[in-house]
């Protein structure tokens, strides 16, 4: 599994780390890739997850949108994981993100994984690890 993410404060990267732990516990080989280092081949893995903080008014980071747009043809028909962090709001960015990918025939595992601010307690950490397991199952 490749985990491709953008993190401005470090929260989304922390979420990615716990998703990685969950996927590894389920037996997957995992590589974490910052979106600025990702290329077209980064989505060739059996499983792919994308991470973004909510920016502006509940929006996916432009860096992640641009990357997915550049590889969307390779993702069509594929199932991906989505995760992110938010500070305020209800996490609407995730449901909108899922809807946008659905239009491109890209299905998402569950309802994504949203963490308010940082994965800084046992419940949030476990949620991330379980999502990592779900992506590779």
Please annotate each region the language model reported:
Residues 36-40:
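Short acidic active-site motifs
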Residues 11-14, 20-33, 43-137:
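FMN-binding flavodoxin-like domain, especially the glycine-rich phosphate-binding loop
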Residues 1-3:
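Extreme N-terminal starter segment of soluble prokaryotic enzymes
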């Amino acid at each position: 599994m490749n985990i491709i993410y953008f993190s401005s404060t470090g929260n989304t990267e922390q979420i990615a780390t716990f998703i990685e732990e969950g996927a590894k516990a389920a037996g997957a080989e995992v590589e974490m890739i910052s979106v600025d280092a990702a290329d077209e081949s980064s989505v060739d893995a059996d499983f792919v997850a994308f991470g973004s903080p909510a920016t502006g008014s509940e929006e996916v980071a432009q860096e992640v949108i641009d990357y997915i747009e550049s590889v969307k043809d390779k993702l069509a028909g594929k199932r991906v994981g989505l995760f992110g962090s938010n500070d305020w709001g209800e996490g609407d960015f995730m449901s909108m993100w899922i809807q946008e990918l659905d239009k491109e025939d890209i299905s998402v595992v569950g309802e994504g994984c949203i963490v308010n601010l940082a994965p800084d307690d046992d419940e949030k950490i476990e949620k991330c690890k379980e999502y990592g397991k779900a992506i590779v199952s």
